[in-house]
Amino acid sequence: MLIIGHRGAAGVAKENTLESLQAGLDAEADILEFDVHTTKDNVPILVHDGNLRRTHKTRVSVGQSTLNQLQKVADKTDYPIATLEEVLDSFFGKIILNIELKQRDCAKHVVKLLKKKYIKKPSDWNLVVFSSFYTSELKTVRKLSQDANLWLLHNRNPFIFIAYARRLGLNGVGFHRLYVNDFALEIAKKTDLFTYAYTVNRPHSAYLLSRKGIDGVVTDRPSTILTEINRRQA
């Protein structure tokens, strides 16, 4: 079972920062997951919410602010804002990167950056994965690259992927940890989809999911989960 570091390693460092991603890499996660929005001037940055209220204690909107404006806000705190380009410069090629597209209309800017600077040959697409709850964003990625890996995220209904698997050419499906349905899991596996659950922070829960045959778990504490899985398999 693969360990996917949630927002890097959000349980041990500030989420969606270079520090958190490095912590996930150091913890020997198999994949690093992080969230991407685009700024008013179309720069992809790492942030989970549409505003900075939770992370920076201000209601400043991400999509209505330029990168420069957002960085000025961040400079007044101890919470840096990383651009996707900075992240790719630091981690592309070292580990598989799971880019979650959190905002409508951001996919095209993300793919443009990847094609411009990082993707040099078709096999390079295997170094990144795109995930989203928005099928429209995954559709955009697929239009721009037939080689991209697409994972559709689900909330309560674990069967939504069935309607989109062939249409979007999905490669994987992410289930909410509380709604991992055995039948849905079976269908996904029969259609050769990578299956994973989010966000799993209890070691025993991760172990039970591994027994179900799920392929991966997203966790804030990759080191803790990895240690438990290895202990049980020893």
Segment roles from a protein language model:
Residues M1-A234:
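Phosphate-group recognition and catalysis centered on beta-loop-alpha active-site segments
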